[in-house]
Amino acid sequence: MAIVGLGTDIVEIERITAHVARSGDKLAKRVLTEAEFEIYQQHSQPSRYLAKRFAAKEAAAKALGTGIGRGVSFQHIHIGNTPDGAPTIDFTQGAQQRLALLNGVVGHISIADEKSYAIATVILESR
């Protein structure tokens, strides 16, 4: 296997908190899949959760070489967790099509947060 994509993104959590305070769930509904949105609504720190998912999806879009847009939507990238809590990444629709163009078969993701920031890195591997 070879690396065919690498992306990293960092988000200031307070920026997301302020956006949620101004606009309610508008950003969350745009960024999160339906399953992610359900978790967001029940999360003890929803803005932190949203910031981490936002960073993860931006990192994934960078790894795909498109950014968000150009056929890849936030909704085409799903960030989940294993039963042990490790993050997982799944691609659908435009993101899956772009991954196939890269001969990519698997995505690896790391997400971290500290007091003020959330950061994510995505590595895509080919066959």
UniProtKB/Swiss-Prot annotation:
One Pfam family it belongs to: ACPS
Catalytic activity: apo-[ACP] + CoA = holo-[ACP] + adenosine 3',5'-bisphosphate + H(+)
Matching SUPFAM superfamilies: 4'-phosphopantetheinyl transferase (SSF56214)
Gene Ontology CC entries for this record: cytoplasm
GO molecular function, one term: holo-[acyl-carrier-protein] synthase activity
Residues the entry annotates as binding Mg(2+): 9, 58
Signal found in the keyword field: no
Signal peptide: none
GO biological process entries: fatty acid biosynthetic process
Paired cysteines (S-S): none
Predominant location: cytoplasm
Cell compartment(s), UniProt: Cytoplasm
EC number: 2.7.8.7
Function, in words: Transfers the 4'-phosphopantetheine moiety from coenzyme A to a Ser of acyl-carrier-protein.
Protein family per UniProt: Belongs to the P-Pant transferase superfamily. AcpS family.
Name the record gives this protein: Holo-[acyl-carrier-protein] synthase
